[in-house]
From Swiss-Prot:
Species the sequence originates in: Alternaria alternata (Alternaria rot fungus)
Residues that bind [4Fe-4S] cluster: 450, 513, 516
BP GO terms, sorted: L-amino acid biosynthetic process; proteinogenic amino acid biosynthetic process
InterPro entries, alphabetized: Acnase/IPM_dHydase_lsu_aba_1/3, Acoase/IPM_deHydtase_lsu_aba, Aconitase/3IPM_dehydase_swvl, Aconitase_4Fe-4S_BS, Aconitase_4Fe-4S_dom, AconitaseA/IPMdHydase_ssu_swvl, IPM_dehydratase_rel_enz, IPMI_Swivel
Family, as annotated: Belongs to the aconitase/IPM isomerase family.
Protein name: Aconitase AMT8
Database matches in NCBIfam families: LEUD_arch
Length: 840
């Protein structure tokens, strides 16, 4: 009976989702005429494939065969794991999942066909084309139109298509809120290009918690409502880990509601972390906008020691270039001869950590621009079904050298000089050699978070094994290791390395953010000292009052015996380089790769480089009439944009989003007002009372809002009643989030302003006059047209509510000059205007 009912349901799905009609009696008769074959759902899908291929429906046959591939893949590799099972051995939940996958992938075929296709790239460079760096090429290729045919340059406003959206269970709450708060439902322009992973808070140890259950329910609802093909569920992978290993490709443009989205730069993708509402608009439309940024180039030279990984490399970069210097408001492009010697995992760690490299939190691009030999890691579930030809070709070009391209600055980093480093709490650029700080005492050692890659975990285990062989004893302390995904767990288990971690006293929770975020099952105690291989060492990051220093996994492993900082080089002398490389090769083979794809290996394929196709301004005419956003603005009668009259609350440089709104408060605060009740509660507990008493203008310093991409930070300020933030500079994501939620942010760099703008001082912000008055002095500021339009329309979500899929077309029109009277339909209470120049 189960077989019959399931067969009927699959036939119905084929009819409804794929417009495919297969007679029930034909399929059942076909199934019955195959003696000696297993009688189960796998065989049913095989037979459907055969029938469709016999009917000449190769595309639909490939869809079902892809579903079949997922069905038989092991669960730890993201499949259902029912290969060879009979009807009696497959439960109802699994049958329901097979039907869902069939429906979702058939829908994906239609959504892909309806989406915008990128133009075919050029096989040869246009002789009139001027050189561009990789970021410019990717943005230009994804642009609906460019202002000139020769190239794009820094400052150009581009409306672009996107390739992927990624999110966590926690950021999905904010994404969903941005539309449901306006009585809209979440939607996706393509149901096969939304990667959603439960990793930030959910944990098997807390599945019973009501808040965690709500997050899990949110994941499942998103999967069903959007017919998602790429919903990873809970604790399968940290959102960045398997996305980069399985889905990201060179040349792609990726948006994510997490600041570490830039991890996909490891494979030469342009991957950008944004706020939840920004990403939700991208998910709904398949579009977004950027101003082309400036770019700096870092060339790697020399050869690193075999045990030096990406964490020590990026700590070396931080040590030399510091934060908020050359990379501020810019993209970073890595290349040089030394890049060829860095594995994909090493590049992942470098890319992942670049979100803390510069507190302006620019989206960091990590191409390997001179490398023609290293291919990315592919696994069984790589989506072969719908290859985007132009993207695949462009991905090859990601390895090209960009002679003559424009870079704001160029630097060289000698990999031969990289050694084990440690970043001292609470700053990621307070870096020094481990050898200079040995003996520091710790209460706990943590190996994990997305920045800790598979090869890091393998090497750390071999360091532990070397210590055990020496007879080193374990002193009292807490030890935790959290691999980034179940596929990595599977590989470590097969190599016997999980047993080594266990022998050394390491707890082994499920894949997730764990102590790197400190809001789930693992929270460091107040006052405790930790050594960690995570990516951030900000104040209160691992837990309220906890102190965390960051370094490589190998350094953590070496230090975890006596719980004091130990240079790993001594134990590394006992580790065989050959064994290490053999283990990495076995991991790669287990994922469906080959040894030839390891760093330094030879690529069998002949590489053909191509150039992006640039569409001119006249390409817009094919889209039809686009309504001006000004025309869609809500009328507020004759009300004019008034001035803000308030008192100042003064803050310092580098105010991070963890300070503005602690991560635990984001979980249980669905409204702006609830978020506001937790604003600065750990670092400035008097802040809320000051705002309520009239200090509604914040004056900050450099890189205000650095750190996490959480949109809850400006929402918390808004919910508390803050009307305006003035700073020397804003972190990219925070600065973009402010107008997206309808809030006013102003950049002022005049030193005289900051001398005059003291705590408690009266201040007037005259938005119509574009000036700030304080202490008898007047300071002008500028307004960005796009941000002004967003704020006049109550933010991006409200603009999308008015204009739907045309929202970015309207935003990216070249606006006519706006008279002052055009500002009459916005009020400061609803966000006011914006006073900063958006450089990207």
């Amino acid at each position: 009976m189960a077989a019959y009912l399931f067969t009927c349901s699959i036939l119905q799905t084929l009819s409804e989702a794929g417009k495919i009609e297969i007679a029930e009696d034909k399929l059942l008769h076909y199934l019955g005429e195959l003696p000696g074959t297993p009688n189960g759902p796998v065989q049913l899908l095989e037979n459907i494939c055969t029938i469709l291929e016999g009917q000449g429906r190769a595309t639909h046959g490939n869809v079902i065969r892809h579903v079949l591939n997922i069905v038989v893949t092991e669960q730890e590799l993201g499949g259902l794991g029912i290969s060879g099972k009979s009807w009696e051995e497959v439960d109802e939940h699994t049958l329901h999942e097979i039907k869902f996958l069939t429906d979702a992938w058939l829908t994906a075929a239609e959504s892909r066909a309806a989406a915008r296709h990128l133009p075919q790239p050029l096989k040869q460079q246009d002789t009139r084309r001027l050189p561009m760096n990789l970021a410019e090429k990717i943005l230009a290729h994804h642009a609906f139109s460019v202002p000139r045919r020769e190239r794009v340059v820094a400052g150009d406003l581009l409306r672009v298509s996107i390739d992927w959206v990624i999110a966590s269970e926690l950021s999905w709450v904010g994404m969903k809120h941005s539309v449901t708060s306006l009585d809209m439902k979440p939607s996706a322009w393509r149901n096969d290009r939304f990667w959603l992973s439960g990793d930030h808070t959910v944990d098997p140890r807390t599945y019973h918690d009501k808040r965690v259950q709500a997050l899990i329910k949110g994941l499942e609802s998103a999967k069903r409502d959007l017919k998602m093909t790429e919903n990873q569920g809970s604790n399968y992978t940290i959102m960045h880990t398997e996305f980069v290993r399985e889905r990201a490709e060179p040349g792609m443009l990726v948006l994510g509601s997490d600041s570490h989205t830039c991890s996909a730069g490891a494979v030469s993708a342009l991957a950008i972390g944004l706020g939840a509402g920004d990403v939700m608009a991208g998910l709904a439309t398949g579009e977004t906008w950027f101003k082309v940024p400036e770019c700096i180039r870092i060339n790697f030279t020399g050869q690193p020691a075999w045990y030096i990984g990406g964490k020590d490399v990026i700590l070396s970069v931080l040590k030399q270039l510091k934060r908020n210097t050359y990379a501020a408001e810019r993209i970073v492009e890595f290349g040089g001869a030394g890049a060829k010697l860095l594995s994909c995992d090493a590049r992942f760690a470098i890319s992942n950590m670049c979100t803390v490299r510069d507190p302006n939190d620019r989206p960091e691009l990590k191409p390997t621009a001179d490398d023609r030999s290293t291919s990315r890691n592919l696994v069984l579930l790589q989506a072969f079904l719908f290859p985007t030809v132009s993207l695949n070709r462009l991905s090859i070009a990601a390895g090209a050298r960009y002679e003559g391209a424009s870079y704001a600055s160029t630097f060289e980093i000698d990999l031969g000089e990289v050694e084990p480093f440690i970043a001292i709490y609470p700053s990621p650029d307070q870096v020094c050699p481990v050898a200079e700080r040995t003996g520091m005492r710790f209460d706990g050692c943590f190996i994990g978070a997305c920045t800790t890659t598979e090869e890091d975990l393998v090497l750390a285990a071999l360091v532990l094994e070397a210590g055990l062989k020496r007879g080193l004893t374990l002193e009292k302390g807490k030890r935790i290791v959290v691999p980034g995904s179940l596929p990595i767990v599977k590989n470590l288990r097969a190599l016997g390395l999980l047993d080594i971690y266990k022998a050394c006293g390491y707890e082994q929770p499920a894949p997730g953010c764990s102590l790197c975020l400190g809001i789930g099952a693992d929270v460091a105690e107040a006052g405790s000292q930790w050594l960690s291989s995570q990516n951030r060492n900000f104040q209160n990051r691992m837990g309220r009052g906890a102190v965390g220093h960051i370094c490589s996994a190998a350094t953590v492993a070496a230090s975890s015996f006596n719980m004091t900082l130990t240079d790993p080089c001594d134990l590394l002398n006992d580790v065989s380089e050959t064994t290490f490389k053999e283990y990495l090769a076995r991991c790669k083979v287990a994922r469906g790769g080959s040894e030839s794809k390891l760093a330094g290996g030879k690529q069998a394929n002949n590489v053909q480089y191509i150039e992006p196709c640039l569409l001119g301004e006249n390409a817009r005419s094919a889209e039809g009439e686009v309504p001006a956003l000004e025309a869609a603005a809500v009328s507020l009668d004759d009300a004019r944009l008034g001035s803000i009259n308030s008192r100042i609350y003064k803050l310092d440089d580098y105010v991070d989003t963890d300070a503005i709104i602690p991560a635990p408060a984001c979980v249980g605060s669905p409204t702006d007002e609830m978020l506001g009740s937790h604003c600065f509660e750990l670092t400035n507990p008097d802040f809320r009372d000051y705002v309520r008493s009239g200090h509604r203008v914040i004056v900050g310093g450099r890189a205000f809002g650095c750190g996490s991409s959480r949109e809850e930070a400006p929402r918390a300020l808004k919910g508390l009643g803050v009307q305006c933030v003035i700073a020397r500079s804003f972190a990219f994501i925070f600065g973009r989030n402010m107008p997206n939620i309808g809030m006013l942010a102003i950049v002022l760099t005049d030193e005289a302003f900051y001398k005059a703008a003291q705590q408690g001082e009266n201040i007037e912000v005259d938005v119509e006059g574009r000036v700030v008055h304080v202490a008898g002095q007047t300071f002008p500021f500028s307004l960005d047209d796009m941000e002004l339009q967003l704020i006049r329309n109550r933010g991006l979500a409200a603009s999308y509510q008015k204009l739907g899929s045309k929202v970015f077309a309207a935003l990216c029109q070249k606006p006519a000059p706006l008279p002052i009277s055009a500002l009459a339909d916005a009020t400061l209470a609803q966000g006011g205007s914006i006073g900063r120049q958006m450089d990207w």
